[in-house]
Curated annotation (Swiss-Prot):
Cell compartments where the protein resides: Mitochondrion
Family that this chain belongs to: Belongs to the universal ribosomal protein uL2 family.
Record's protein name: Large ribosomal subunit protein uL2m
Signal peptide range in chain numbering: none
Native source species: Neurospora crassa (strain ATCC 24698 / 74-OR23-1A / CBS 708.71 / DSM 1257 / FGSC 987)
Heme in keyword set: no
Name of the coding gene: rml2
A cellular component annotation (GO) from this entry: mitochondrial large ribosomal subunit
Subunit and interaction comment: Component of the mitochondrial large ribosomal subunit (mt-LSU). Mature N.crassa 74S mitochondrial ribosomes consist of a small (37S) and a large (54S) subunit. The 37S small subunit contains a 16S ribosomal RNA (16S mt-rRNA) and 32 different proteins. The 54S large subunit contains a 23S rRNA (23S mt-rRNA) and 42 different proteins.
Amino acid sequence: MLQPQFRPLLAGTASFAQTVLGRTVARCYATKAATQSASSTSTSNTSKDAKAKIVTPYVRDAGMMRTYKPHTPGIRHLKRPINDHLWKGRPYLPLTFPKKGQSKGGRNHSGRVTVRHRGGGHKRRIRMVDFERWIPGPHTVLRIEYDPGRSAHIALVKEEATGRKSYIVAADGMRAGDVVQSYRSGLPQDLLDSMGGVVDPGILAARTCWRGNCLPVSMIPVGTQIYCVGSRPDGKAVFCRSAGTYATIISKEEETREDGTKVMTGKFVNVRLQSGEIRRVSKDACATVGIASNIMHHYRQLGKAGRSRWLNIRPTVRGLAMNANDHPHGGGRGKSKGNRHPVSPWGTPAKGGYKTRRKSNVNKWVVTPRVRNMGVRRNKKTT
């Protein structure tokens, strides 16, 4: 049996682990208020200075990777994020359907290969994830599940009013028992009554902008990290859906009234993606507060080629090693591609392509494009 070894990524020692892991942290995720008992708040502080309180750091299982003793060569370099909170059983079958047919091998309806290096993986069931979240009201998180079709984890939520279940992309830190809501269809009447009929942006943000809640972008304060961001008022989430991704709201078109309250006057909100690109999205587009779950996904190491095959990933063969009828670099005796510049399998130059694109082909929704090729590539908006 594999014996896991826990190695914190933080540069800590045994004393640091005893200090951090030995304490209990009161969890408060999403919109569920956590009650802390008096016994848990009373700590055994023997310091003479009673006013000096030690702040307990936030401990996350996702901040560690799991390694194994190398009983076999395939697990010597294997590293996995520690996600012991995931559901161990099968998915909710009414929200899934099997993936089968030629599409699993990267083929289209006519049988031609449209996506290379795919095929032969483990059988899967596609999870139908709700990226729109139009249904209002509180939803209870039943469990956090692994989804083979995406890098982020998904959460099975149940609507408290009707008992309807659905899948959503889980936020980092979301756990079973949390309560999330969607305010995309409008504010509920009980929330307006509790605020006295006056909608103050600051109080409204404090009542609604909690982790896992879906809101229009105009209701989220500047500087908030969001994921599953939409671009159109009636569209679904299209940005920041992978594991560990998020966007940041950087500016709005607002004006300040005489009483000090801010009112949004423009139609768009500027958000900054992790690539550095700043985009304009509609103020009524959807966004979820938080960061997409499974933030340690990019630190994983598969350890062997067989795990890539399990994940439906086929080998990538060099064009130089192919035959002449399979690739422009193929053929010849030995490693010889001739005196030709490197090209793709379809003959397009591999380093830059054909420089025939018009400068007028500019995306009007991009305010500041991302830096490409370490700043060497020219910007179409400035040239």
